[in-house]
């Protein structure tokens, strides 16, 4: 690759080609100016508003006082002139200078667009002119002279007389229309008089007199630079005797750019107000520059390229591509027809540079380095260029003739003389005589050299002719380009409206194109020069036929193979550039065929490239213009289709990705009329999406006026003139309404929608995010500069290689210093083209880091501070160790070794930087003195340094201990605050997680999703993992038993016994754990022991159906290893029970599901606490070992040396304080369980419990949040499942199949029993959610699988069978009545309380009782067989209800005869009418019954399980 030269073109085409440049660079420059002035402008506006009100009233009075003071100074100046002997001319100069200062203000203010503040001119006190009295007569108008007071009025009369004479002689005054020069030319005689005045004696007399007479001087508070014209006489050269003539103003041959005059010349400055400090003079403010830009922009609103060209000039000057005179010439040429703008540009020029306007409307440019000259207008410049071209053509014709006569030579010499004469006129020097004398002194011996000179001139003329032809071609090309400029600008606006970033790509293409053309021109010139050089060499070889020694250096000619290699390399570069140029053009004009075609017409060389280029280039452009998606187009004939193999598919795919449309598969067809006579249309391009659709959508929804305003607003946003918020706020004003469709479209493009679904990246119809203008967040000045830097780099990037390497345009490769000649293979791997630039991906301003919490911020800050302190202490100790070793070695040396021993600059330490840093920390600025002393006397110096270091070590160690305590206390406070916040968050989360509805909905939702998707997946809906620790299961049961006392709806201890029995036996069996033995004591002395015997199922069923009043108490016996009951049946049953422990299957309803979920939550927390205790215990043991080693003295030797005992004690105490060694936490888990049991027994409140647990497990306090509510929820659901007296009881159903499952010897038998068990559960639990639970203990990782079977409504036939059952109840209900009827009548009305439900103990039956109470009294008797209780059975019921206490009760074992006798009892036959309604009817029919009978009915209603 090559580095293209800077600049877009060459020759005289720069001005015309500037009109075609896009406004991207100009916009970036203006953006940079606005960004730099933003903060300064705001600050100045605030100060100006505050001071404006205070100064406004005083300003008028101060101005009048200043004028009066100025007039007094002028009068005093004129009065003091009579003290000095000088001629009337000097007096006139002083008078003219004073009057010119007054007229200068208004004249400068009128010619400038920037508001100028007129003030009084001031003379700097430090100016050399103030100390040289002779210089006062030559001061410019803006520096008033200071002279002593006049003694009398004689000088005033002389001045008045002289003024009258001069007016009579029509001497021009300073207040005339034409401004008088600041320093007039002094005649020769008068100049000599002034020079004589500078003699030493006169100067001493004047200075002595000046010291005697008080002089009124003006005090200044600012620095005003002295103009370079007014130098002191002492520094000026001697005045020549010749009278200098005013040099004529010669027009400049090139357009110039002026510089500004100092502020004093533009109208002076204000005098200092009393009590107000004046700001120093500085460069033009940013607001002035912005105001000047606004005036230019508004003036040339119809001719926008002028404004853009002005910004490009300013950018070139800022990049130091052009100098100050070039800027002035170009600006004057650009703004030639606007004098107020040209003169206003003086505001921004340096001191000494100025543009003035002559009466004939010509601009004169003056600068300190050159004489004033007239700036040409654009027409004059073009005329001169044409004239210069014509002269060059004439010279070529003359040089091509065979003979050159002497007259023609004389003509050429005359022309040279005229040119030199004009040049002398420009410089103000008349050298005609010198030139004539130089020509006459030529010798005849130089005729041969003259002939050679003429030959070289002819060759140069030939080159000029070629350059002239090139310039004419460029002029013609520029005229053609000007015809298409407006068209290409309109196409650019339309094409890049919705994607302004593409404008940068187009700009890059234009620059690359112009650079490529310039490179080709340069290469063509080089070829021509080489050919001319070859011709000259051949001619010289022919002339030099005479043999002889030659001292001329001979050029070494390159071999032919090297020339061929260079030519092939250049040809390869041109071809690659052409290919890359076409690719850039295609990438810029993606989706814009009209713009692509207009660009080809707009750039003539591009058309030549397509015509003269390779077939691949031409085919590439043609396929871009005429390619159509032929895969899904049947309406295009095969003849007109393009072969896909000839198409650049990568480019087409890229074009497809970057488009947008209103629909995903929409196609945009662009057609143009064919060239044939038939008039058929030719499809240029067929795309699925296009940016034109966005413009069409806006155009269809707006009026032309609204669309115009909208385009202006969008362009302002794209140029970063307004923010996104301002754009959004202006949309309703343009549309007239709020919430219109157009407003919604623009909001989607800007990404202003709050809903994620409405964002553009989620909308298939919206513009792709990468083509949208970036959302500009509020950035500071630093971020804005970074953004501008990124944009500049992106604009200058031609292509990239990886994320960081870029090929930049206008970048010259820097020559590597020290590189030697290498082989071609080695040179190929060197990088001379690519520039490494950061990608800024990791510094993206749109992304923000996660905000740290207060605890994290404190941790970071504390760790940094502790690290710094530790580095200081450790570095000091390291230096002490090294210097101590050096001192010990020195003391052990002999006298001879001591004399030869020397210390280096770092005291022989291993780490130089550490030693210097520590010594500088301890001794500050005296460190080097101590080092020098130690080098002179090592023994004394090292001892003194070690004493200081050890003293600092003790001081810093104490400080470290104090800071460690402070940091630890602060960390504890921060940790406590953070823990409190975290606990509150977890409490809110746990309160929602403990509710039954979310837990049930969780598994129901999974089942519903599978059902909707018709999934055949049979995997579990939910899997819960358990801990393998056996102890945790028993601990959960122990703690749960203490949370039953406060349950609503419980019946004292009778329900608690059933709950304990379920928890210790059934639940543990479900979880494949060994159940604990439970012993139940009845009121008659019977004892039920549950330890895994054959009758355990029957006993469990009996106790669950038994009235709790008969239970005296229960005891949980630990698992016994004694052999008290070793019957064969018990052993056989126990073996089966333990063999099947690895897998359990059972069914349940919502209550069982909630029991499993709550039990799993508690078990998981207990397992976490137990593992944390193990970690704490291990840490405690490790700390004890370390502390023991420390006490034994292993850690006392720091850095391999023995420290003092006092230091050891302090370090040991500091380490103990930091480690904060606690007692052994092995009992923390047991202590927590005791605290939980006290909490369950209401012996402790939740606040005291949290404080106690916080000391035991400070990092796991969140595990105990809402622990009381979690246990209460578990106890409530266990109570509801075990004490429910309904037929659909899943626990009773499990006990029915439990023994059959345990006795199954084969897996097939067990599966059949489980299948039957599941079918029965689905029938019994119909109308509720049925869950299947399967607990598996596998490889010491137990888990439970849960399936849910959605609820089904009961059929009407099933309800009729239950209500019309004439035979009464089934066998299970009869057993329930038998077991529940024993011993009734003790607690009376307490039996009416139903078991608690899962909905916080709400009793629905009580509500039915209240609703049915009034209607039940008036309900007629039912004579059908659905509601009567036969009276002949009352005695049976009475005898049954009131059996004597000595009646035999059920023992642990029942014989077959007892079961048959029990089943033969004739129970009362009642219908399935609701229980409370039967009770009320019986009371109504038998009002005369005694109390015992009524009580019997009440207890009967409580025992018989009716629906």
From Swiss-Prot:
Comp. bias intervals (Polar residues): 16-26
Disruption phenotype: Uncoordinated movement, protruding vulva and ray fusion defects in the male tail. RNAi-mediated knockdown results in sterility. RNAi-mediated knockdown in a him-8 mutant background results in no deposition of dimethylated 'Lys-9' of histone H3 (H3K9me2) on asynapsed chromosome pairs.
GO biological process: cell fate specification; defense response to other organism; locomotion; negative regulation of transcription by RNA polymerase II; nematode male tail mating organ morphogenesis; response to endoplasmic reticulum stress; vulval development
Tissue localization of expression: Expressed in all ray structural cells including ray 6, 7, 8 and 9 of the male tail. Also expressed in the inner labial neurons, socket cells, the cephalic neurons in the head and the ventral nerve cord.
Main location (coarse class): nucleus
Pfam families linked to this entry: PAH (PF02671), Sin3_corepress (PF08295), Sin3a_C (PF16879)
Keyword set, alphabetical order: Nucleus, Repressor
Biased composition regions of type Basic residues, renumbered to the chain: 270-279
A GO CC annotation given for this chain: chromatin
Keyword RNA-binding: no
Ranges for region Disordered: 1-26, 228-286, 397-450, 543-569, 1349-1434
Role noted for this protein: Probable transcriptional repressor required for the deposition of dimethylated 'Lys-9' of histone H3 (H3K9me2) on asynapsed chromosome pairs (both autosomes and sex chromosomes) during meiosis, but this does not seem to solely affect the transcriptional status. Plays a role in ray fusion and patterning in the male tail, and this may be through activity of the histone deacetylase complex (HDAC).
Protein name from the UniProt record: Paired amphipathic helix protein sin-3
Higher taxonomy: Eukaryota, Metazoa, Ecdysozoa, Nematoda, Chromadorea
């Amino acid at each position: 690759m090559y580095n293209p030269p800077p600049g877009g073109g060459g020759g005289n085409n720069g001005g015309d080609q500037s009109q075609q440049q896009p406004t991207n660079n100009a916009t970036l420059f203006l953006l940079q100016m606005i960004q730099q002035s933003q903060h300064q402008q705001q600050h100045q506006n605030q100060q100006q508003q505050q001071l404006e009100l205070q100064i406004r009233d005083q300003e008028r009075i101060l101005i009048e006082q200043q004028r009066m003071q100025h007039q007094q100074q002028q009068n005093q100046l004129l009065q003091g002139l009579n003290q000095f002997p000088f001629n009337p001319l000097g007096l006139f100069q002083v008078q003219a200078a004073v009057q010119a200062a007054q007229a200068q203000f208004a004249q400068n203010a009128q010619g400038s667009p920037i508001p100028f503040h007129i003030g009084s001119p001031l003379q700097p006190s430090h100016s050399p002119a103030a100390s040289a009295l002779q210089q006062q007569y030559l001061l410019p108008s803006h520096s008033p002279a200071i002279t002593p007071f006049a003694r009398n009025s004689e000088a005033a009369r002389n001045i008045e007389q002289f003024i009258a004479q001069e007016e009579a002689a029509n001497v021009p005054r300073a207040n005339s229309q034409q401004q008088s020069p600041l320093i007039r030319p002094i005649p020769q005689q008068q100049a000599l008089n002034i020079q004589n005045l500078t003699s030493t004696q006169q100067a001493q007399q004047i200075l002595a007199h000046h010291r005697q007479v008080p002089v009124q001087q003006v005090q200044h508070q600012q620095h005003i630079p002295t103009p370079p014209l007014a130098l002191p006489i002492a520094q000026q050269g001697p005045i020549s005797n010749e009278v200098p003539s005013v040099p004529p103003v010669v027009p400049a041959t090139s357009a110039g750019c002026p510089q500004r005059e100092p502020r004093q010349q533009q109208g002076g400055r204000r005098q200092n107000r009393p009590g107000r400090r004046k700001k120093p003079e500085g460069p033009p403010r940013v607001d002035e520059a912005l105001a000047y830009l606004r005036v230019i922009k508004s003036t040339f609103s119809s001719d926008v390229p002028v404004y853009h060209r002005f910004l490009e000039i300013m950018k070139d000057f800022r990049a130091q591509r052009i100098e100050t005179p070039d800027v002035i010439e170009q600006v004057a040429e650009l703004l030639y027809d606007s004098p107020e703008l040209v003169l206003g540009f003086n505001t921004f020029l340096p001191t000494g540079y100025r543009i003035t306007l002559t009466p004939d409307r010509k601009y004169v440019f003056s600068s300190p380095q050159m004489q004033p000259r007239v700036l040409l207008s654009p027409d004059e410049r073009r005329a001169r260029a044409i004239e210069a071209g014509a002269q060059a053509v004439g010279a070529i014709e003359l040089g091509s003739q065979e003979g050159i006569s002497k007259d023609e030579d004389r003509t050429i010499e005359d022309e040279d003389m005229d040119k030199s004469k004009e040049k002398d006129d420009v410089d103000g020097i008349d050298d005609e005589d010198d030139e004539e004398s130089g020509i006459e002194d030529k010798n005849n011996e130089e005729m041969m050299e003259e002939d050679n000179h003429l030959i070289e001139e002819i060759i140069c003329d030939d080159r000029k002719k070629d350059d002239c032809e090139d310039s004419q071609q460029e002029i013609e090309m520029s005229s053609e380009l000007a015809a298409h400029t407006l068209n290409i600008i309109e196409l650019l606006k339309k094409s890049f409206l919705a994607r302004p970033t593409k404008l940068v790509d187009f700009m890059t293409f234009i620059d690359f194109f112009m650079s490529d053309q310039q490179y080709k021109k340069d290469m063509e010139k080089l070829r021509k020069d080489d050919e001319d050089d070859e011709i000259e060499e051949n001619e010289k070889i022919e002339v030099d036929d005479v043999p002889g020694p030659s001292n001329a250096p001979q050029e070494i000619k390159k071999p032919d193979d090297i020339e061929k290699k260079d030519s092939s390399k250049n040809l390869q570069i041109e071809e690659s550039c052409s290919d890359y140029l076409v690719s850039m053009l295609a990438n810029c004009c993606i989706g814009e065929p009209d713009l692509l075609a207009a660009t080809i017409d707009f750039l003539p060389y591009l058309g030549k490239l397509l015509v003269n280029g390779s077939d691949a280039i031409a085919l590439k452009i043609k396929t871009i213009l005429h390619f159509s998606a032929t895969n899904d187009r049947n309406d295009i004939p095969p003849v007109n289709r393009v072969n896909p193999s000839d198409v650049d598919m990568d480019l087409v795919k890229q074009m497809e990705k970057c488009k947008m449309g209103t629909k995903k598969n929409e196609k945009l067809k662009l057609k143009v009329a064919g060239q044939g006579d038939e008039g058929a249309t030719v499809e240029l391009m067929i795309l699925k999406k296009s940016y034109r659709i966005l413009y069409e959508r806006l155009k269809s929804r707006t009026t032309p006026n609204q669309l115009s305003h909208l385009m202006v607003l969008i362009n302002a946003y794209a140029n970063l003139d307004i923010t996104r918020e301002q754009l959004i706020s202006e949309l309703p004003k343009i549309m007239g309404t709020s919430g219109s469709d157009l407003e919604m479209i623009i909001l989607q493009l800007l990404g202003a929608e709050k809903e994620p679904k409405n964002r553009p990246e989620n909308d298939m119809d919206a513009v792709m995010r990468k083509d949208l203008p970036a959302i500009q967040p509020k950035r500071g000045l630093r971020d804005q500069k970074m953004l501008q830097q990124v944009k500049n780099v992106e604009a200058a990037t031609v292509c990239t290689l990886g994320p960081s390497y870029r090929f930049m345009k206008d970048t010259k490769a820097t020559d590597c210093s020290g590189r030697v000649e290498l082989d071609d293979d080695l040179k190929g791997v060197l990088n001379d083209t690519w520039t490494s630039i950061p990608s800024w991906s990791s510094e993206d301003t749109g992304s923000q880091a996660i905000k740290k919490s207060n605890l994290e911020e404190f941790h970071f800050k504390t760790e940094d501070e502790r690290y710094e302190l530790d580095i200081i202490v450790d570095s000091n100790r390291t230096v002490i160790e090294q210097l101590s070793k050096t001192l010990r070695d020195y003391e052990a040396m002999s006298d001879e070794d001591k004399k030869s021993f020397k210390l280096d600059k770092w005291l022989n330490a291993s780490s130089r930087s550490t030693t210097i840093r520590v010594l500088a920390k301890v001794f500050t600025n005296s460190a080097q003195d101590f080092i020098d002393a130690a080098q002179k006397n090592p023994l004394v110096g090292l001892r003194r340094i070690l004493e200081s270091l050890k003293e600092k070590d003790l001081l810093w160690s104490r400080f470290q201990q104090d800071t460690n305590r402070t940091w630890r206390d602060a960390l504890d406070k921060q940790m406590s605050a953070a823990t409190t916040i975290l606990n509150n968050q977890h409490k809110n989360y746990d309160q929602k997680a403990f509710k039954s509805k979310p837990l049930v909905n969780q598994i129901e939702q999974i089942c519903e999703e599978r059902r909707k998707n018709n999934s055949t997946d049979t995997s579990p809906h939910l899997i819960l993992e358990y801990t393998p620790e056996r102890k945790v299961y028993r601990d959960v049961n122990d703690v749960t038993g203490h949370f039953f006392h406060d349950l609503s709806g419980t019946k004292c201890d009778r329900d608690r016994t059933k709950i304990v029995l379920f928890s210790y036996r059934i639940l543990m069996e479900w979880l494949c754990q060994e159940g604990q033995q439970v012993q139940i004591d009845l009121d008659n002395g019977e004892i039920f022991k549950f330890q895994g015997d054959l009758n355990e199922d029957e006993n469990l069923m009996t106790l669950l159906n038994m009235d709790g009043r008969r239970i005296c108490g229960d005891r949980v016996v630990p698992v016994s290893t004694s052999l008290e009951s070793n019957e064969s049946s018990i052993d056989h049953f126990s073996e089966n029970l333990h063999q099947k422990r690895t897998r359990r299957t059972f069914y349940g309803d919502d209550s069982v599901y909630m029991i499993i979920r709550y039990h799993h939550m508690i078990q998981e927390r207990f397992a976490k606490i137990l593992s944390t205790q193990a970690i704490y215990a291990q840490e405690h043991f490790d700390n004890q070992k370390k502390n023991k080693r420390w006490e034994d003295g292993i850690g006392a030797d720091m850095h391999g040396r023995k420290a003092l005992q006092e230091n050891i004690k302090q370090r040991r105490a500091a380490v103990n304080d930091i480690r904060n060694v606690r007692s052994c936490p092995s009992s923390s888990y047991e202590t927590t369980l005791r605290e939980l049991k006290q909490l369950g027994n209401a012996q402790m409140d939740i606040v005291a419990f949290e404080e106690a647990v916080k000391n035991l497990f400070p990092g796991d306090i969140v595990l105990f949040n809402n622990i009381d509510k979690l246990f209460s929820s578990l106890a409530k659901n266990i109570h509801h499942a075990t004490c429910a007296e309904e037929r659909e009881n899943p626990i009773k159903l499990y006990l029915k199949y439990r023994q059959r499952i345990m006795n199954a010897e084969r897996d097939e038998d067990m599966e059949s029993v489980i299948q039957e068990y599941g079918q029965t559960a689905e029938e019994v639990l119909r109308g509720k959610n049925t869950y299947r639970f399967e607990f598996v203990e596998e490889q010491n990782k137990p888990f439970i699988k849960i399936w849910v079977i959605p609820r089904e409504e009961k059929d009407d036939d099933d309800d009729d069978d239950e209500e019309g059952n004439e035979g009464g109840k089934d066998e299970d209900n009869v057993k329930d009545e038998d077991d529940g009827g024993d011993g009734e009548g003790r607690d009376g009305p307490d039996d009416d309380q139903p078991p608690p439900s899962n909905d916080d103990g709400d009793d629905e039956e009580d509500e039915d009782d209240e609703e049915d109470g009034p209607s039940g009294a008036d309900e007629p008797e039912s004579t059908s067989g659905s509601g009567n209780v036969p009276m002949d059975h009352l005695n049976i019921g009475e005898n049954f209800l009131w059996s004597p206490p000595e009646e035999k009760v059920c023992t642990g074992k029942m014989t077959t005869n007892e079961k048959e006798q029990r089943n033969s009892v004739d129970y009362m036959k009642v219908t399935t009418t609701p229980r409370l309604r039967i009770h009320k009817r019986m009371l109504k029919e038998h009002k005369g019954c005694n109390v015992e009978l009524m009580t019997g009915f009440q207890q009967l209603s409580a025992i018989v399980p009716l629906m």
